[in-house]
UniProtKB/Swiss-Prot annotation:
Pathway: Amino-acid biosynthesis; L-arginine biosynthesis; L-arginine from L-ornithine and carbamoyl phosphate: step 2/3. Belongs to the argininosuccinate synthase family. Type 1 subfamily. Disulfide bonds: none annotated. The keyword ATP-binding applies. Homotetramer. This is Argininosuccinate synthase. ATP binds at residues 13-21, 40, 121. It comes from Brucella anthropi (strain ATCC 49188 / DSM 6882 / CCUG 24695 / JCM 21032 / LMG 3331 / NBRC 15819 / NCTC 12168 / Alc 37) (Ochrobactrum anthropi).
Length: 406
């Protein structure tokens, strides 16, 4: 293609799946470019050696497969959870938060290998194209970015399957003998889109769910766990200190076994359309409940309420792909400052899809039983003081009422 005629070497974000395997072959045949592959181990729960073998089969000489699980949770997931970030009230941003990390490594590998372009498999209809490219440009303003879904003649996955068959590219099959749902997975979540899920009125079949058992079949006995926090980050489960990735993986196990973290969502994409997806975020759902609980006793009311006001904007920045933007970094600095005293332990009950906070404690707690007791508080609080407080706060309301009754 003439627009890419100067591109000699491309780093491809490669999963080994249908789209990126076809993109790899397309880059070779249509652009005549040398391709370098990068496969990130984000904790997606699948063996990555098949991706290496597939790349080798397609003639790739430089293959990068990197375990980025700890970096992912430590530098991306945990900072996001300090903000209690959810998009449109429910989505825990599992796909969104992984994209800037992938872009970061694509840019680094391009620099190491002397590549003049990077490529990704995101479609021209979705959010991921924006997330990958905004992140890449923020890190290297001169990088060339190839997005084949916006350039090639294929208009559907049916056409992709035909191309794959022509070039003898193996394609995985699901239980029905068809090409699988469009799936994204990492240590934080998994998502499924496409096929019957494109009709928002139709319930997702059970086999779509990869990370959790159904709440109906979850154990009849509740699971009790304790999560320890330091400076807003989870550091332990049941008293055992764990690395960030190990801790999230363990929470995923607890969530999976108790049917926690399923979400059937129609969301507003950045590009303007609505889309339906089925998400599973077992460990993240538990972590969010625990983090909000420890904040409830360690954050001042004003700071907590301001943080809640800022959260939707922060979540939107991540969803839209602005992780490396100055405004996200500014908000992160404020959020991180708020977490200095967010430490302690939260006890949770996990039962049939539910996460229930049943206890929270901290040496930095602002909760005072002397102030809130219904018994004798030994002079800790003078209830007579409330009269003046109410009178001053009612002043403007009484003034308005006096005017309006005339």
């Amino acid at each position: 293609m003439s627009k890419w005629k100067d591109v000699k070497k491309v780093v491809l974000a490669y999963s080994g799946g249908l789209d990126t395997s076809i993109i790899l072959k397309w880059l070779q045949t249509e652009l005549g470019a040398e391709v370098v592959t990068f496969t990130a181990d984000l904790g997606q729960g699948e063996e990555l050696e098949p991706a290496r073998k597939k790349a080798e089969m397609l003639g790739i000489k430089e293959i990068f497969i990197e375990d980025v699980r700890e970096e992912f949770v430590r530098d991306f997931v945990f900072p996001m959870f300090r903000a209690n970030a959810v998009y449109e009230g429910v989505y825990l941003l599992g796909t969104s938060i992984a994209r800037p990390l992938i872009s970061k490594h694509l840019i680094e590998i391009a620099r190491k290998t002397g590549a003049d372009a990077i490529a990704h498999g995101a479609t021209g209809k979705g959010n991921d194209q924006v997330r990958f490219e905004l992140s890449a440009y923020a890190l290297n303003p001169d990088i060339k970015i190839i997005a084949p879904w916006r350039d090639w003649s294929f208009k559907s996955r049916t056409h992709l399957l035909e191309f794959a068959e022509q070039h003898q590219i193996p394609v995985a099959k699901d239980k029905k003998g068809e090409a699988p749902f469009s799936v994204d997975a990492n240590l934080l979540h998994s998502s499924s889109e496409g096929k019957v899920l494109e009709d928002p009125a139709v319930e997702a079949p059970e086999y779509v769910h990869m990370r959790t058992i159904s709440p109906e079949t979850a154990p009849d006995k509740a699971t009790i766990i304790k999560i320890g926090f330091e400076k807003g980050d989870a550091v332990s489960i049941n008293g055992e200190r764990l690395s960030p990735a190990t801790l999230l993986a363990k929470l995923n196990d607890y969530g999976r076994d108790n049917g926690i973290g399923r979400l059937d969502l129609v969301e507003n994409r950045f590009v303007g359309m609505k889309s339906r997806g089925v998400y599973e975020t077992p460990g993240g759902t538990i972590l969010l409940a625990a983090h909000r609980a420890i904040e409830s006793i360690t954050l001042d009311r004003g700071a907590a309420h301001l943080k809640d006001e800022l959260m939707p904007r922060y979540a939107e920045l991540i969803y839209y792909g602005f992780w490396f933007s100055p405004e996200r970094e500014m908000l992160q600095a404020a959020i991180d400052h708020s977490q200095r005293h967010v430490e302690g332990e939260v006890t949770l009950k996990l039962y049939k899809g539910n996460v229930m906070v049943i206890g929270r404690e901290s040496d930095k707690s602002l909760y005072s039983d002397k102030l809130v007791t219904f018994e004798d508080d030994q002079g800790a609080y003078d209830q007579k003081d409330a009269a003046g407080f109410i009178k001053l706060n009612a002043l403007r309301l009484r003034t308005l009422a006096a005017r309006d009754r005339k």
